From Swiss-Prot:
Gene name in the database record: petN
Membrane topology: Single-pass membrane protein
Protein's recorded name: Cytochrome b6-f complex subunit 8
UniProt key word Lyase: no
Keywords: Electron transport, Membrane, Photosynthesis, Thylakoid, Transmembrane, Transmembrane helix, Transport
Length: 33
């Protein structure tokens, strides 16, 4: 179970960072990155 939680959190952080890069390159303006 601990491995599942660790994998889920890792996937969440990875997808979140990818979203930050995509939103930053789109020049959305709502997020200042």
């Amino acid at each position: 179970m601990l491995f599942t939680i660790a994998w889920a959190s890792l996937a969440a952080v990875f997808s979140f960072s990818i979203a930050m890069v995509v939103w930053g390159r789109n020049g959305d303006g709502t997020l200042n990155f």
